[in-house]
């Protein structure tokens, strides 16, 4: 059997009843990965040997009947450290880097009995919105292999959407979980900043980065967040977990819930069919008893400019550690120390990474700091205040996840600014440190349209409540790409 149509709870019941073993489930998952990998290129590393060792140990210890994730396979984005498994951030610079520790999120998942089956492809160092900047080649969209899967967590999204795995981890700096979730028709959540430890995450923008879950359904997504969320002394920005169970409100009705619909999220640059889909979703929420009203987030239009100054500045600082000396790629043609630095970085980093390093270095340079980085920080505060004003009166914000559906591979490579604008609707959430989810809300041109729900800090259970209410009364999440197939 392939098991790819079974929910996590159904798989758990099979494991507890011993109808299948963790080893059998892991072997079936590995076969699912291999059979689809040529079409998708969603993995950098398939950790077959390590996964089977983990599965055997779980079978010998026995499945934990009280833990729904015991024995469940998990794919992990390649910028999240995994003990003994290559972690390259999809870059030539880290082509041979094998950590000797697990990221806290991975360690937490393993503590729950989850089995790491591989590392997923991504935009290099999480810098990209299309899944095309990877040193290991572009990932393909699960619905149409001529389209981008979104980025930067391209492989994590495509792997879940295609049925390679049921659950995966990604990271979100400016939309890198939500946008690929939207493009692939699955559920992806960026938690509140600090909810999931960043220890072991290869840093891009440290004030923006957050690890989060991908799953086919809202409840499965919440179950994975339950496993990975924790306060962590190794991450000074992590926060105490305020919610014991992120699934606690799933199944409750949303009568009287106040949902804001920002006019800026449906304005210029939004595909007409995407706009229509979101307006129909808003009407659906009203049918479920929610109150949906138009609001304004006036400073959101500056989000992309603010983000690319702040994120690139933080990246230029974070990536200084990759110098060809301590680990990773070292240029062989260097004759002195300066050449080792220059050549290793020139050859080890891809074009998009180098572009952002240069942009960030410029923004932080003497004479330009006040005009760019400092000003960006001030506008970031205005964006945060916009959200605070709305959340004083509303429970959630509703809008599209992306301005369009997935676009053609290689169509925006020549125009980085156009690609940056694809994150227009997700970036403000990261700038404000808020939680946001993307769920399937319809189709345009045969491709999934994502609906984004945003909440105030630490409101994940309310986001899941509303998302689950929408999911329970629609069928969009049940539709699968051809590559998904079904149970044998």
Curated annotation (Swiss-Prot):
Gene3D superfamilies: Amidase signature (AS) domain. InterPro entries: Amidase, Amidase_CS, Amidase_dom, AS_sf, GatA. Keywords: ATP-binding, Ligase, Nucleotide-binding, Protein biosynthesis. It catalyses: L-glutamyl-tRNA(Gln) + L-glutamine + ATP + H2O = L-glutaminyl-tRNA(Gln) + L-glutamate + ADP + phosphate + H(+). One of its GO terms (molecular function) is glutaminyl-tRNA synthase (glutamine-hydrolyzing) activity. The keyword Aminoacyl-tRNA synthetase does not apply. One of its GO terms (biological process) is translation. It is an enzyme of class 6 (ligase). The active site is at 77 (charge relay system), 152 (charge relay system), 176 (acyl-ester intermediate). Its EC number is 6.3.5.7. The keyword ATP-binding applies. GO terms for cellular component: glutamyl-tRNA(Gln) amidotransferase complex. It comes from the Bacteria. Allows the formation of correctly charged Gln-tRNA(Gln) through the transamidation of misacylated Glu-tRNA(Gln) in organisms which lack glutaminyl-tRNA synthetase. The reaction takes place in the presence of glutamine and ATP through an activated gamma-phospho-Glu-tRNA(Gln). Belongs to the amidase family. GatA subfamily. Heterotrimer of A, B and C subunits. This is Glutamyl-tRNA(Gln) amidotransferase subunit A. It comes from Streptococcus pneumoniae (strain Hungary19A-6). The gene is gatA.
């Amino acid at each position: 059997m392939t098991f790819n149509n079974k929910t996590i709870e159904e798989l758990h019941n099979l494991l507890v009843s011993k109808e299948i073993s963790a080893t059998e489930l892991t072997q079936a998952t590995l076969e699912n990965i291999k059979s689809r990998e040529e079409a998708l290129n969603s993995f950098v590393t398939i950790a077959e040997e390590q996964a089977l060792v983990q599965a055997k140990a779980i079978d010998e210890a026995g499945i934990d009947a009280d833990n729904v994730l015991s024995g469940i396979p998990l794919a992990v984005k390649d910028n999240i450290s995994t003990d003994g498994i290559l972690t390259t951030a999809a870059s030539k610079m880290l082509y041979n880097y094998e950590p000797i520790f697990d990221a806290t999120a991975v360690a937490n998942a393993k503590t729950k009995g989850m089995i790491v089956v591989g590392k997923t492809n991504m935009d290099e160092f999480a810098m990209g919105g299309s899944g095309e900047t990877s040193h290991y080649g572009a990932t393909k969209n699960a619905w149409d292999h001529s389209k981008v899967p979104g980025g930067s967590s391209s492989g994590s999204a495509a792997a879940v959407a295609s049925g390679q795995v049921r659950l995966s981890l990604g990271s979100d700096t400016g939309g890198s979980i939500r946008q690929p979730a939207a493009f692939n028709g699955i559920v992806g959540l960026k938690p509140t900043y600090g909810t999931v430890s960043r220890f072991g995450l290869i840093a891009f923008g440290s004030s923006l980065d957050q690890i989060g879950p991908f799953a086919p359904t809202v409840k499965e997504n919440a179950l994975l967040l339950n496993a990975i969320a924790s306060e962590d002394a190794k991450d000074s920005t992590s926060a105490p977990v305020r919610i014991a169970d992120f699934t606690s409100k799933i199944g409750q009705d949303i009568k009287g819930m106040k949902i804001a619909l920002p006019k800026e999220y449906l304005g210029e640059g939004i595909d007409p069919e995407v706009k229509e889909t979101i307006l129909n979703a808003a009407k659906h929420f009203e049918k479920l008893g929610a109150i949906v009203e138009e609001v304004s987030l006036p400073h959101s239009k500056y989000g992309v400019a603010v983000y690319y100054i702040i994120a690139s500045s933080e990246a230029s600082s974070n990536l200084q550690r990759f110098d060809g000396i301590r680990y990773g790629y070292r240029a062989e043609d260097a004759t002195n120390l300066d050449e080792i630095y220059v050549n290793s970085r020139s050859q080890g980093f891809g074009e998009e990474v180098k572009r952002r390093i240069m942009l960030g270095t410029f923004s932080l340079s003497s004479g330009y700091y006040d005009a760019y980085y400092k000003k960006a920080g001030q506008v970031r505060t205005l964006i945060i205040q916009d959200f605070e004003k709305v959340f004083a009166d509303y429970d959630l914000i509703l809008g599209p996840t992306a301005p369009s559906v997935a676009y053609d591979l290689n169509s925006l490579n020549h125009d980085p600014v156009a690609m940056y604008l694809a994150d227009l609707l997700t970036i403000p959430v990261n700038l404000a440190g808020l939680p946001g989810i993307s769920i399937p809300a319809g189709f345009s041109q045969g491709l999934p349209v994502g609906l984004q729900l945003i909440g105030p800090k630490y409101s994940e259970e309310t986001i899941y409540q509303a998302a689950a209410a929408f999911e329970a009364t629609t069928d969009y999440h049940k539709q699968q790409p051809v590559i998904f197939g079904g149970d044998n």
